Amino acid sequence: EQANVLDLYSGTGSFGLECVSRQATEVVFIEKEKKAIKILEKNIEKLKIKKETKIFSGDVFYIIKKNDKTFFDWRPDMKFDLIFCDPPFNDTNINDLIELIITRDLLKKKGIIILHRHKNTKEKLTIYFKVIDKKIYGLSKIIFGKLLPSSP
């Protein structure tokens, strides 16, 4: 409740839309697939939650790393309580994504990052990410974590 949520690789937005239904203050979606964005836009319209949501169309790294004007001008000091990261299962740069979140200072001090990975993914997560819980659902592994205070 009352959370600012960033949904990276949001697809059709099921996670972020669920957050709005649970009283999130604002959900920001970043997705590059045009078909997924069209479905997301229709869902937002049907649910009448346009004022609680914002969609950015494009590559996550481009939008955040390149200091995309539309993203950072929209809410210059925006920090998120919850960041959901659902990159394609074959995407191996999850640590780059975590480090980008750190570099851009997107997570609030007590914020949580949720990673959605394939259950068989064996990756060594950056030392700046502390796993606080893991769940397996079918082929999915959900990892809940926090950034350590010593993050660069």
Stretches with model-predicted labels:
Residues 1-152:
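Class I S-adenosyl-L-methionine-dependent methyltransferase catalytic core
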